[in-house]
Amino acid sequence: MATDIKQLVKEVLNRGYLMSLATSDNGGVWVCDVIYIHDDDLNIYWMSDPDVRHSQAIIANNKVAGTITISGPGESNLGIQFEGTAEKIEGNRYDLALKHYAKRKKSAPKENDDVLGGDSWYILKPKKVELINEKLYGFDKRRIEL
């Protein structure tokens, strides 16, 4: 069953566009939306300015949580909730840029383009994921631990 749930989680990641990312710092909790991409291990990547609050919070406290919701009004609820750790990734990461540009329906950058423009890449490594798929399971969440 865990394999099936992991595949359903991947489907949500494939269909989604924005992730709501929750962080915490000395000022309290904070949430922001970021455009994300993912890999086959369910790791989630995004670009952000390293000086914004959520990026600074990750440096101070790498424990994060998030949600990705696919459904809209009148549709069955579909999405994921997760917790894990996040960190900044060094480098231009052209491989990530290609996926990110494709997701945003932009032309592929050239390998030597400055795709970050002052931003940095970040990775979220989920530890627990809860799937909400009302069509298949009602409101009985399915969970996987990674």
Indicate residue ranges for each PLM-predicted region:
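Charged, gly/pro-rich active-site loop segments
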Residues: 78-146
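Short solvent-exposed loop/turn micro-motifs enriched in small/polar/acidic residues
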Residues: 14, 28-29, 114-117
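Short beta-strand segments
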Residues: 16-50, 58, 64-69, 78-81
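Short, surface-exposed beta-strand-loop junctions and turns on beta-sheet-rich folds
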Residues: 52-54, 73, 137-139
